[in-house]
Every structure is written in C-alpha cells, then in structure tokens.
Amino acid sequence: MLRDAWLVATKDLQIERRSRVTFGQVVPFAGLVLVLFGFALDANRPVLLQATSGLFWVTIMFVSTLAVQRSTSIETTDGARRALLLAGIEPPAVFVGKSIAVAVQLLVVEIVLLIGVVVLYSADIEAWGLVFATCLIATVGIAAAGTLLGALVAGVRARETVSYTHLRAHETRPY
C-alpha cells in the first residue's frame, strides 16, 4: 500500500510541477490575502501584531481549499480515478498519496507565507522550531481532512460550495 501511495503522491506532484498552479495561482493568492489583511489592520499596528498567527492560519485554510480542490479535480476531470482502480491501486493508497501531495504543496506555501508574515507584518518569531513543528503537524491534519472532504464531494455537482465552514456549522458547541 505504501508503494501505491507513493506512486499517487509523485504523480500528483509531477502534475503540479508541470502545471505550476501552486506557484502561479495559489502563492500569489496567499500573498494577496496577507497584504489585504495588512491593509485592513494597519491603522492599529499592535492589533496586527497580535493577530498575525491567526491571519497566517486563516490564509492557510483559504489556500488549502484551493489545493484540495485542485487535487480532487485532477482525478475527476479525465477519469483518472477509474484508471487508478483498474490499475489495482486501493482507495486507501489513493487517499494517503493525495494527502501527501497536498501536504507537500501546503508546506511550500507555508514557508513562503512565513517569509511574507515576517516581512510584511514585522513579526518577531521567537521559537522557529515550534513554528515548524506546528506547521508540519497542522499541515498533515489539514491535508488529510481536506482530501477526505474532497473525496466525499467529488461526485457532487456543487462541490465548490462545500467547505470547512459547512462541516463546522453542524458542530454542537458547548455553552
């Protein structure tokens, strides 16, 4: 199974390398979101510095929806999902492989965004090791949850409207 997952991940990463969607569309979008947040809160510099980590993760969530949508569309547009099944690759291997590919793409975007946060917001990061560990763990979780959500809504016509907020809207909240 791990070999098949690795094959799916390398396939998705090769497609991404050829199409350059992450660097051509996703990274500029993420940078634009950071700049817009900076304009929105620049009048109150202390608030911007306090909100930097939250703005970083909100931007990552926006970017993750784009990355997951792209990963899912690769399989659904030309019937690649059926080809993978006919090739004998099990669905869990496809899930793991796609999660790895999305996680790698998100890690690249997070590195660029960290540089952007330091440059644009003058953020002072005290514990780089903790930041990288948090990014790694959160990225694995976001990629796995996003890939699962993408697989669940792959056949739905209005799949673009299904997002993380829809899943969270039905959570029970203790008051």
Residue ranges and their predicted role:
Residues 1-26:
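Aromatic- and glycine-rich beta-strand/loop motifs that create alpha-glucan
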Residues 91-118:
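Selective transmembrane-helix segments that form parts of the transport pathway or gating/packing helices
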Residues 132-151:
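Hydrophobic alpha-helical transmembrane segments of polytopic membrane proteins
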Residues 52-68:
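Long, hydrophobic alpha-helical segments
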Residues 83-91, 170:
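Short helix-to-coil transition segments within interhelical loops
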Residues 165-166, 170-175:
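Conserved small/polar residues in nucleotide/adenosyl-binding loops
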Residues 16, 65-85, 99:
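Transmembrane helix boundary and interhelical loop/hinge segments in multi-pass membrane proteins
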Residues 40-51, 115-134:
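Membrane-interfacial helix-loop-helix connectors in multipass membrane proteins
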